[in-house]
């Protein structure tokens, strides 16, 4: 059991990507293995964006834990359920993230909302107690309050992601070395606010797919 302080958390946006590499196979496994075309260039430790015929992992970001020629292991991508992941239907492509840009001047007010399980009411007329069954989860939204400074090196990258309305990867590294990666829609405020006599702004991330958490 550990209590992890948030001070020292590093947030980054994917600033460049490699060319997408097509899959010829994607396995059902606790850590799915993608067979890629030759010359893919993917190495152990790389983070990749997954495009897949399996909707539950489409758009997710994963770390590569092993490479054996053209077989690439996607750490933390569990596809063992053939109900959720029908065999042979998951092929697509992966795109390697080749550079990250760290965000600076994030204040201590980082907040997370969403992700809560939603339920449908299935109460029947004969029931004396309401019944519910789980459906979807609400979207995860992370708000990063920052001290406003348009000259910061990360601003053009975040602004481009905000303007494009295309999901772009985010990486959060916590002080204990654990990390979270995901694909999110970025939004950067156009007009700064004033708080405690300083200019502030807000970077909002709305996750487009389930994030992946790693202990190290």
Task: For every predicted segment, state its role.
Residues 101, 154-183:
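Short, acidic/charged, Gly/Pro-enriched secondary-structure junctions
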Residues 126-130, 188-189:
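Short structured motifs
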Residues 155-156, 214-216:
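Short, charged, solvent-exposed linker or helix-capping segments at domain edges/interfaces
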Residues 171-215:
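Short beta-strand and beta-hairpin "edge-sheet" elements
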